[in-house]
Structure formats: C-alpha cells, structure tokens
Regions:
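Surface-exposed assembly/interface segments
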Residues: 1-181
Length: 181
C-alpha cells in the first residue's frame, strides 16, 4: 500500500489499486487521468463552545472527512489540536496551533487557517469537521486515457474507471470496448 501511495499519491486511483491488490490482483496497470474539476472542501461543522474558528482551503486529493479536535484551550501558539484525515478512525500527533495560524495537512491538498483572539479562543473538546470531495475528470479525458492505454498492446481482463461517471460515459466505453475486442 505504501509503494502505491508513493506512486499515485493519496488519490481515488491509489485507493482502487490498493483494494485490487488486497483482493488478489497480481498485475495492475494504473493510468492517472488529469483532473478537470478540482476537489472541494466544505466549511467547518463546529461542535462545542469555543469561539475560535478554522477555515479549510485548497484542492483535496481524495474523498475524506477531516476532523480537528482541540486538545488544550487557548489562543494560537498556546492551544493544541489533533487532526484526523479519516473521520476519526485515527489521529495525528498533538500539535500547537501555530502563531502563523496555518497548518498544511500532508498529502491531502488542504490547508487549515486558525483564527482566535481574546474572548474568542479555542476550547478543549471542540471539534471542527470538514468534508472533502475528490477531483474528477471529464468523459473526454477518460476516453482519451482508455484509447492511450489501448496503444500499450497489453492483454487486460478489465478496465476499472475510478471516480464518478455518467451513463453517457459508459455508452461510449461500451462502444470503445467492442472496437478493442
């Protein structure tokens, strides 16, 4: 899994390849398709009594739920937090909310901006939850990738398209698949 993430990043394609290997695939050819729609990150769903705020920005690399939990109350450079990139299943190390007010969450494409002032501090136990959506490719880019793959002259059992798709894409893929037989 680690080697796949090194090659493909924290992406839906990496997730699909890892799932395939874990379920018995012995050979995988992975062809990333350039995103045409950037990932999106929601506004914070804040639970708790603190008045400090956190905003998320950037272009998420995958679908995930990002949670910031305040561990120690206070202003920036005093309050501490932990961050989960998987909806609270696991947590990163406790870190001080920096005076520079931003934390870049590694391998996610997301930067968090923290704001606090006297009377508007972070409070221990508060959580800030963000929903991220993965980037997406358009139908034309996916079809071009399948055509490019065809030029590799390798025998394949199936082609797995990762991401959101439409009926129009599947109709086009069916026609292309028939031509490839």
């Amino acid at each position: 899994a680690e080697m796949i993430r090194e090659k493909l990043g924290n992406s839906p394609l990496a997730d699909a390849c890892i799932d395939s290997v874990e379920n018995g695939a012995s050979t995988i050819y992975a062809l990333p398709v350039k995103e045409t729609t950037h990932g999106k990150i929601s506004k914070a769903d804040h639970q708790g009594t603190g008045k400090g705020t956190i905003e998320a920005s950037g272009n998420p690399t995958n679908d995930f739920t990002l949670i910031v939990q305040i561990e120690t109350s206070g202003l920036t450079n005093a309050a501490t937090c932990v961050i989960s990139e998987n909806g609270g299943q696991s947590w990163g190390d406790e870190q001080t909310i920096p005076l520079s007010v931003t934390i870049t969450v590694p391998n996610t494409g997301v930067t968090l901006t923290f704001t606090a002032s006297e009377g508007n501090q972070f409070v221990a136990g508060d959580t800030y939850t963000f929903e991220a959506t993965a980037p997406a490719a358009n139908n034309g880019d996916i079809l071009d990738a399948v055509k490019k793959f065809r030029s590799y002259m390798v025998t394949v059992e199936l082609i797995h398209v990762v991401g959101t798709s439409t009926a129009a894409l599947w109709g086009s893929l069916e026609s292309l698949g028939a031509a490839m037989e």
